[in-house]
Design a protein with these regions (language model features):
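Alpha-helical bundle segments that constitute or directly flank the non-heme di-iron/ferroxidase center
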Residues: 1-29, 81-105, 119, 123, ...
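Residue-level recognition of alpha-helical structural elements
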Residues: 4, 34-37, 80, 106-110
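A short small-residue
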Residues: 24, 31, 71-75
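Conserved alpha-helical segments that form or flank metal/cofactor-binding pockets of metalloenzymes
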Residues: 32-67, 127-133
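Short alpha-helical
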Residues: 33, 47, 93, 109, ...
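Carboxylate-rich helix-loop segments that flank metal/cofactor sites and access channels
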Residues: 50-96
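Long amphipathic alpha-helical coiled-coil segments
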Residues: 65-72, 97-115
């Protein structure tokens, strides 16, 4: 079970990194329409953090509140495109990691919240791609 909580905490850290990257993207974006899309997706990621933290607590673990260093790196001359590319890479990583965990027997009661986090990321990937083209 502790291995499962550890894996979920890694996903939560990645989710926090998404929130951080989207905050940077909001400040880099000059287009009000695109800025609203970024803001909405950032709020979804914040909700995902709460959902993941609740799953971790339900499994008897303690949720992390530190963003993943792997996805939190900031380039010195980072453009909006760079930030959003890193964010989308993180989103896809989260989708894949949750997919790998959904069949775990110990996660039976947490499948719905995890599937919802996964689904929100899939929708946000499509939403962001359509808004940025």
């Amino acid at each position: 079970m502790s291995n499962l909580v550890g894996k979920l905490n890694e996903i939560l850290a990645d989710e926090w990194a998404c929130v951080r990257a989207l905050r940077r993207a909001e400040s880099q974006c000059d287009d009000p329409g695109k800025g609203e899309v970024i803001k909405r997706i950032r709020k979804d990621c914040s909700v995902n953090c709460v959902s993941l933290a609740n799953v971790i607590r339900a499994l008897g673990g303690r949720p992390t509140d530190i963003p993943s260093p792997r996805f939190s790196l900031k380039l010195s001359d980072e453009s909006l495109t760079d930030t959003l590319d890193m964010f989308q890479s993180t989103q896809q990583h989260i989708v894949d990691e949750i997919a790998a965990l959904l069949d775990e027997p110990d996660l039976k009661s947490a499948r719905s919240p995890l599937a919802l986090v996964q689904q929100l990321h899939k929708e946000n990937i499509r939403w962001l791609k359509s808004a940025m083209t």
